[in-house]
C-alpha cells in the first residue's frame, strides 16, 4: 500500500519554527484531543453519533485531521466500517493518504488511543477550541473592517460585529439541541400547565391582542409562533398590526419591537398617536389640532414615555441576519421581548438568493420562524396577497392567495386575513366592520372574528354586535 511513511508528528502540527515568527500567537487547539477523537473512532465505530453531534470536520485545527474526519464521515455514510485498513484505502483513493501522514500516522493514531471511553469529552475539547478560534477570526475580521470600513458607518460595523458573533453563538446552541426523553418533556409540560392553572389569565395564555373575540379564538399571540397578517391594499393590515403592537405595549411591560421596512418611524408614530389618542390622523399629519386634540395627544405621549417599551427600526431592505441580530440585542438588554412586528415580509432581502425569489422568500419565512422559536416570542409578519383574488366574486382571502404562499403557509403557526366589504362595495351593509379571517391556526380553530374599523383614528376596536358564530 502506498504512503507507508514513518510517523512524523509534524504532519499533525503546523510548522512555525522560524525565529522571526516564534513570537506569534498560535490559535488555541489540542492536537492530543483531536488525535484521541480520530483514534477512538477507529477503535469503536459505535461512538460516531456521539462525536458527530459535537464536532464537524472544520472544528479540527490541522488540515490532515480535517481530511481524516471527512473521510471517516464518508465511510460512515456509505455503511462501511471505519478502521485502519478501510480508512487508509479510502484516503488513498482520494489521493490524500500521503498528505495526512501516510499509513504510519493512521496506525499511530490507532495505537496511541487505548480506548474510546472518553471520546465525547475529547470531542467537547475539540469543539471548544474551535469556537474560540472562530471568535478570534471574527475579532480579526471586525478589526480589519474598522481599519478599512469601505464607507460603512459605525452602526453598520456594530451590526456586522453582532451578527458575526451571534452566528457563532447560534451554531454552538444548535449543537446542544437534540432528542429529549419523554420524561423531560413531560416535566416541562406539567410545569407549564401548573403555571397556567395558578395564574389567572382569562383564557389568554399568550400576548393579549386587546380584542376579546380574537383572544377567544387564539388565546392570545403565542410565544414562538410565526403569525402572518395579510390583506389587499387599503384593508388596513399595517393599522391592524400596529394596533396589536400598541395593545401589547399597553398591557405588558416587556418591550415590543417594530421593523418598518416600508414606512418611516415618524409616520408610524403619528399613526400610533392617532390610534391611542383617538384623534383624527389627518389632523395630526397637517398640524390642524385644537386644544382638546393636544390634550389627548399629550396624555398619550406621557403614557408612552413612561412605559418606554416600544422600539422602531425603519431600516429598509433588512436581511434576516440583521433582523435577528437587532432583535437579540433588544432581548439581551431588556431580558426578553414581548412581541416583534415586521412590515412587511416581502421587503426583506437575502442577497445570496436574490436571483430566485421563491427560495429567497422561503429563507425569509424560515428565518422568522426560527427567530420566534429562539427568542420564545410571537413574531407578527405582514404579507402581500396575490392580485388574482380580485377576479373572484367573493374576494375574501384564502391561504393560497398569499404571495409566494408555499413556504409562508408552511412556516406560519397562525394566518390572519383582513377583509372589509366596504372597500369593494360602496353601499355595503357592513360599513365600518372588518373581518379577521383565521385561515390557519396550528393549535386552534379557524374561523372569522368581527372588529370595528375606525379609519380616521387608524384603529380597529372590539365589535359590539354579534359574531358570525353567534348568528
Curated annotation (Swiss-Prot):
Gene3D superfamilies: DNAb Helicase, Chain A, P-loop containing nucleotide triphosphate hydrolases. The keyword ATP-binding applies. Keywords: ATP-binding, DNA replication, DNA-binding, Helicase, Hydrolase, Isomerase, Nucleotide-binding, Primosome. InterPro entries: AAA+_ATPase, DNA_heli_DnaB-like_N_sf, DNA_helicase_DnaB, DNA_helicase_DnaB-like_C, DNA_helicase_DnaB-like_N, DNA_helicase_N/primase_C, P-loop_NTPase. Residues 200-467 form the SF4 helicase domain. ATP binds at residues 231-238. It is an enzyme of class 5 (isomerase). It holds the Pfam family DnaB_C. The keyword Nucleotide-binding applies. One of its GO terms (cellular component) is cytosol. The main replicative DNA helicase, it participates in initiation and elongation during chromosome replication. Travels ahead of the DNA replisome, separating dsDNA into templates for DNA synthesis. A processive ATP-dependent 5'-3' DNA helicase it has DNA-dependent ATPase activity. This is Replicative DNA helicase DnaB. The lineage of its organism: Bacteria, Pseudomonadati, Pseudomonadota, Gammaproteobacteria, Enterobacterales.
